[in-house]
Amino acid sequence: VSYIDDLLRAYARFVSIPWDSSVAGPQRVWMAVYPPEQERRLRLRIGEFANATRQAGHGWHLVDLTDSFGSWLGAHEYRAAYFESPEDLKLALEQFAEELAAHVRTQLTAEHVNESSVVALMGLASLFGVARVSHLIQAVNNDIRGRLLAFFPGELEGTNYRLLGARDGWNYLAVPITASEG
């Protein structure tokens, strides 16, 4: 049995439990925590997470953020200057974070997303060093209708999440889903 098998089993249990509609936005966030080296296996099996969601009677909407920074930078007016002087990019990263939050917010509030939907965020590792996952999730908290599932390649220590094992961690009200619960 693999780590992803156990994570999938734990997720299937979580998604099938009746949802409390009175919880606040931060408590509507589920963090599926897994070791970063399991990323490829998770991506190969993402359809099984979608199936588990649908079998539990909920909608599934996947938002892959993997290419978001590259796409944003490629379309940026000053992209050539940033490649020449990468330190200048630091000032523009706040704009990227705001645009990323707006993109996720649009997905969370799309017409086809309702109180019984799971919106899953994938590709969070690609944000490392350019945007903080904690800030992204906090920026969209109030827009979560059903549940926001964040596939989180990192660690959970108590109630602190650490992206890729680095100190981008934060103490958060999100509900953790780990393979040890499978």
Can you say where each PLM-predicted feature lies in the sequence?
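Long, charge-dense
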Residues: 59-105
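A short acidic (Asp/Glu
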Residues: 40-46, 72-75, 129-135, 159-163
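Conserved P-loop NTPase "ATPase switch" module shared by AAA+ and STAND
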Residues: 114-130
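Glycine-rich, aromatic-bearing surface loops/beta-hairpins
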Residues: 132-182
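Short, charged beta->alpha transition segments
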Residues: 15-19, 101-110
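Short acidic, S/G/P-rich loop/turn micro-motifs used as interaction or catalytic elements
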Residues: 36-41, 68-69, 94-99, 125-129, ...
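Residue-level preference for the first positions of well-ordered beta-strands
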Residues: 28-31, 118, 147-149
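N-terminal, charge-rich interaction modules
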Residues: 2-77
